[in-house]
Amino acid sequence: MKINALKSALLGGEYDARLAYIYGEAAVVKQRDRYAAAIDAFVALYGADREGALYSVAGRSELSGNHTDHNHGRVIAASIDLDIIAVASPNSEDIIRLKSEGFHEDVIDINFFTTPREKPEGHSDELIAGMVAGFRENGYTVGGFDAYTTSNVLKGSGISSSAAFEDMIGNILNHIYNDGKIDNVEIAKIAQYAENIFFGKPCGLMDQVACAVGGIVAIDFEDPKSPVIDKLDVDISGMGYNLCITNTGGNHADLTDDYASVPQEMKSIAAYFGKPVLRDLAEESFVASIPLLRGKYSDRAILRALHFFSENRRVAEQTEALKAGDLDAFFANVIASGRSSYCYLQNVYTTKNVEEQGLSLALCLSERLLANQKAAWRVHGG
């Protein structure tokens, strides 16, 4: 559809049902205006006399399974109504031009930027190039396009702005050049490749899968090449509950070293037993060997491994609780997951700056506010 016709259809209400499905009835007018503004921004940059389409990829919140995916564990995650949207149109130049609101335009020659930089710089052009490279390596068709994006998935907020961006690039390439035939899990795997190899961040697969698949999902990464995804048919909002994400004023965008230490330390414990990841290790063998591990490995690494095993069990229990509609059991394990994350995983604040503990303060205040109510609180990722 031509860009101008796309805008007319949007403002004429032809997409209201879809907008209501994604954002809720009350947000339709606001979102209609948001998409129309994105079309106007695209036209100002790239022109109106061309074919185009609209795209949306949601951010995600982790409900349980904090830092388990990279050791082939289990997670529960939910897509949220904060998302990145795009207006995109193919071109015949093998050039990708992408302007994100508030950022400089990325311009990438897909026949030139085909391998990772010697030292990744953490720039968005690396994610785009990584997605193109991943598509090629998997035998999919790639090509140039022009796109404008705008997002309310805040950078560094723990709701996976980078994963949503990667999945967005994948969806554009999928629908423009591959007839939409690539499934969302495959796009998520390519997105993880882009972030690991081109962007230089050692993430697991949970963020990308949760953003790509949508809804509430329980994911088992025991075989990361074929994760088992259980889409949970549960309407927590319909039960009278909302997920609220507190902006503590911090930012984890510059904490890559802290982030990377978690899988590194967990895998170092697994390596002692000749295993690549903790999922392949029997918990009983690990616990029995703690006296031998102390001195060889840091106490923090041991604590993080203990967190992994407990968290993996919690996810299984919470999955069954959600299926049964047992919110009491689910909430109890959400709180237990948060305590384990704080005490044993130790990813609530950085040891590089102990003076700043916005998350710790928010958790303390949340507990004071919500204790003795049918509610729960935790750090939701990072």
Spans of model-derived segments:
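C-terminal nucleotide
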Residues: 1-57, 85, 89-121, 218-379
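A short glycine/serine-rich beta->alpha loop
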Residues: 51, 67-74, 112-121, 151-159, ...
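Glycine/serine-rich anion-binding loops at beta->alpha junctions
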Residues: 56-72, 152-167, 374-382
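Structural signature of FAD isoalloxazine-binding scaffolds in flavoprotein oxidoreductases
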Residues: 74-92, 213
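DPxDG-like acidic metal-binding loop motif
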Residues: 79-81, 159-179
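Glycine- and acidic-rich phosphate- and metal-coordinating loops
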Residues: 132-155
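Phosphate-handling active-site elements
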Residues: 137-145, 173-187
